[in-house]
Amino acid sequence: MNPTERITTPHKTGEAKVIIFSAPSGSGKSTIINYLLAQKLNLAFSISATSRPPRGNEKHGVEYFFLSPDEFRQRIANNEFLEYEEVYTDRFYGTLKAQVEKQLAAGQNVVFDVDVVGGCNIKKYYGERALSLFIQPPCIDELRRRLIGRGTDTPEVIESRIAKAEYELSFAPKFDKVIINDDLETAKAHALKVIKEFLGIDTE
């Protein structure tokens, strides 16, 4: 199954905003997001739903909303997701509309870390209320070097991630802003500036 392409009626313009991050694995996206969440920007991370079991000390409603595969399918049928993906049989990930609306209603600017298709879907749903950012590695060779440097994946997994990254990079023009992460501190500063401008915060 491919990620859903279903788009529902956009939300009316409000004060709180939506900030979407997508990127290939190894681009430094998570590091940049964690840096931004630590700034005083009233940002709140969007908690995804998943049908996989909790790992270790993971708690429902903290790391993820844990649903059974049948519960996930029922919520899909009820059109409760902004976006979702079945990565393989019975292993779903997605973003629940009600949770995001709850955060926005509380005045929080909601940050998403999603795949490129999910990012495009959320941007379509929220329109001008959303800023979509694509974090891009300087080149595929550098991405391969970073993935090898992690020391967590087999060569086969790394090549699979590289192939996926080449597909994901083709989506970059669909995003509002592309931030090239060839230097992490520069990329963090660039992302901070772009988000402050979007939120109407003085960047001086």
UniProtKB/Swiss-Prot annotation:
It is found in: Cytoplasm. The keyword Transmembrane does not apply. Keywords: ATP-binding, Cytoplasm, Kinase, Nucleotide-binding, Transferase. It catalyses: GMP + ATP = GDP + ADP. InterPro entries: GK/Ca_channel_bsu, Guanylate_kin-like_dom, Guanylate_kinase, Guanylate_kinase_CS, P-loop_NTPase. Signal peptide: none annotated. One of its GO terms (cellular component) is cytosol. The keyword Isomerase does not apply. Belongs to the guanylate kinase family. Essential for recycling GMP and indirectly, cGMP. HAMAP family: Guanylate_kinase. This is Guanylate kinase. The gene is gmk.
